[in-house]
Amino acid sequence: MFPLAKNALSRLRVQSIQQAVARQIHQKRAPDFHDKYGNAVLASGATFCVAVWVYMATQIGIEWNPSPVGRVTPKEWREQ
């Protein structure tokens, strides 16, 4: 008896899920904020971040730890 009841319940669940999916497919939903402005917000945020990094890297005057090769001369070795 248990397998029969289990099978009946699983079929009921599957049918209810299928009905819910069918209702959602046929239902016309209005576009939300992300549908309307999602790509524009993403593009403007990426542009802003790139602009800030470019400004910071070129205009602020941060010393970016360049290589000392060719600019540093070694001192003479002193033996004691």
From Swiss-Prot:
The chain crosses the membrane at residues 33-59. Pathway: Energy metabolism; oxidative phosphorylation. It is found in: Mitochondrion inner membrane. GO terms for biological process: central nervous system development; mitochondrial electron transport, cytochrome c to oxygen. It is a single-pass membrane protein. InterPro entries: Cyt_c_oxidase_suVIIB, Cyt_c_oxidase_suVIIB_dom_sf. Belongs to the cytochrome c oxidase VIIb family. This is Cytochrome c oxidase subunit 7B, mitochondrial. It comes from Bos taurus (Bovine). The gene is COX7B.
